[in-house]
Curated annotation (Swiss-Prot):
Family in the record: Belongs to the apolipoprotein C4 family.
The gene coding this protein: APOC4
Keywords of this entry: Lipid transport, Secreted, Signal, Transport
GO process annotations (BP): lipid transport; positive regulation of triglyceride storage; triglyceride homeostasis
One CC-aspect GO term: high-density lipoprotein particle
Broad class of the protein's primary localization: secreted
Role description: May participate in lipoprotein metabolism.
Protein name: Apolipoprotein C-IV
Leader sequence residues: 1-27
Organism: Neomonachus schauinslandi (Hawaiian monk seal)
Keyword NADP recorded: no
Compartment(s) of residence: Secreted
Amino acid sequence: MLPPGLSPQALPSLCFCILVLACVVACQQAVPTESPSPQPELASGFWSLVPDNMKALVTRTRDKWQWFWGPEAVQGFVQTYYDDHLKDLSLRSQAWLKSSKDSLLNRAHNLCPRLLCGDGDQN
């Protein structure tokens, strides 16, 4: 059952929006920050700098790409997708169904013997 005020033509775009929103939420969920304690032989020297450098790199990358995961970017993508692919879907579907029905009726009429179906002009 559709929510009040929602037409059946809006259902595909609503499902797509929910799918995009679910992907965004799944990607933004926090990754556990606890890491296993370093092994004693790797705790000194060059390898001891790796966790700090990786944390800084991940933080910088996350900050630079934060705009991409913001609601404006997703909303813009969804709006563009709707405008390009879904806006006139109802009209295109209706036209396709009508042409398919007409084509099917013409083929069926052509297969029907004249004795049973009569001439097409008598309708």
